[in-house]
Amino acid sequence: MAGLSIWHVVIFAIVVILLFGTSKLKNIGKDVGGAVRDFKKSVREEDEAASLNSPRTIDAQAKTSESTSVKS
């Protein structure tokens, strides 16, 4: 059987905890979370910078006012 049962996952988790310890796993989790947060922040900043630099078109009718008299 190629699938993982719940017992495989439980045994794997116990082995990982025994090897690394809970404090080490917590630090690894913090580091991975910080890396993901920084990556999302940089992607968001690039998207905002790209949207500010992209050319924009304005769809509007030009209005002209004609004045025939000139005041001096």
UniProtKB/Swiss-Prot annotation:
Residues 47-72 are annotated as: Disordered. The keyword Cell cycle does not apply. Gene3D superfamilies: 1.20.5.3310. Belongs to the TatA/E family. It comes from Acinetobacter baumannii (strain SDF). It comes from the Bacteria. It is found in: Cell inner membrane. GO terms for cellular component: TAT protein transport complex. Pfam families: TatA_B_E. InterPro entries: TatA/B/E, TatA/E. It is a single-pass membrane protein. The keyword Protein transport applies. Part of the twin-arginine translocation (Tat) system that transports large folded proteins containing a characteristic twin-arginine motif in their signal peptide across membranes. TatA could form the protein-conducting channel of the Tat system. The chain crosses the membrane at residues 1-21. The Tat system comprises two distinct complexes: a TatABC complex, containing multiple copies of TatA, TatB and TatC subunits, and a separate TatA complex, containing only TatA subunits. Substrates initially bind to the TatABC complex, which probably triggers association of the separate TatA complex to form the active translocon. Keywords: Cell inner membrane, Cell membrane, Membrane, Protein transport, Translocation, Transmembrane, Transmembrane helix, Transport. Residues 51-72 have a biased composition (Polar residues). This is Sec-independent protein translocase protein TatA. One of its GO terms (biological process) is protein transport by the Tat complex. GO terms for molecular function: protein transmembrane transporter activity.
